[in-house]
């Protein structure tokens, strides 16, 4: 499945009104375990928009050096790397691949994020293919605000365990009878300490089979 072609085909058929989209792919090559890391959707950072100001609809693609080497993308890769085991291979993915400032603005543009929405449906088709092609990967959702979509899309069972951080705030969720899926506190969260990051790392390391 050519993710870039499928995204552009839908965008050309039904103009989303979004500034761009992200193609899932490897953002850090490592010799360690593989992680597919999900966010809600790609944000629209100011320096990204300036870098692609002359494009009607831009694509972030890990295979495109120019598009994947923006300042915001480098910052983002660093943040994700800080909470994963050393030398991990990181695949960036999204619940929805079209850009926006937040969930509300995204739904204002493309409609409710649910099955039957063409942008939602294509994103899940891409994600199913991505996971199928990386069966050994652990699946991580960043943040808890949009965990409803994560659980609905992947039909996750009830929570098995919640691990709290230094300030006693939720740090990580594990799912009962499914040791591949986790939700972790967003790496941009205020108050996330180095001790918290290490706790996330060690929990994930202990789940690697």
Predicted features by range, described:
Residues 80-84, 204-207:
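Alpha-helix C-terminal capping segments
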Residues 1-70, 76-79, 123-133, 171-177, ...:
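Active-site and ligand/interface coordination hotspots across diverse enzymes
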Residues 35-39, 88-95, 138-143, 183:
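A structural signal for short, well-ordered beta-strand segments and their strand-loop junctions
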Residues 41-45, 96-100, 144-148, 186-190:
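Short, solvent-exposed loop/turn segments at secondary-structure junctions
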Residues 130, 135-155:
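Acidic, glycine-rich loop-and-strand cores that form catalytic or ligand-binding grooves
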Residues 82-135:
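Internal catalytic-core helix/loop-beta-alpha segment
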Residues 1-16, 113-124, 147-209:
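C-terminal capping/extension of enzyme domains
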């Amino acid at each position: 499945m050519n993710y870039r072609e499928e995204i552009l085909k839908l965008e050309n058929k039904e103009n989303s009104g979004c500034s761009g989209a992200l193609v899932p792919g490897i953002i850090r090559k490592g010799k360690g375990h593989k992680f597919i890391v999900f966010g809600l959707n790609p944000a629209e950072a100011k320096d990204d928009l300036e870098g692609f100001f002359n494009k009607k609809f831009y694509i972030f693609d890990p295979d495109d050096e120019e598009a994947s080497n923006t300042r915001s993308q480098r910052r983002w890769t660093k943040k994700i790397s800080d909470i994963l085991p050393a030398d991990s291979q990181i695949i960036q993915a999204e619940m929805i691949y079209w850009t926006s400032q937040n969930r509300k603005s995204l739904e204002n543009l493309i409609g409710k994020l649910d099955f039957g929405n063409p942008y939602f449906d294509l994103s899940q088709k891409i994600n199913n293919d991505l996971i199928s092609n990386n069966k050994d990967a652990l699946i991580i959702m960043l943040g808890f605000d949009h965990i409803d979509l994560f659980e609905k899309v992947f039909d996750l069972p009830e929570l098995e365990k919640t691990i709290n951080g230094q300030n006693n705030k939720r740090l990580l969720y594990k799912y009962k009878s499914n040791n591949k899926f986790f939700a972790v506190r967003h790496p941009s969260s205020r108050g996330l300490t180095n001790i918290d990051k290490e706790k996330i790392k060690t929990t994930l390391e202990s789940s690697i089979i």
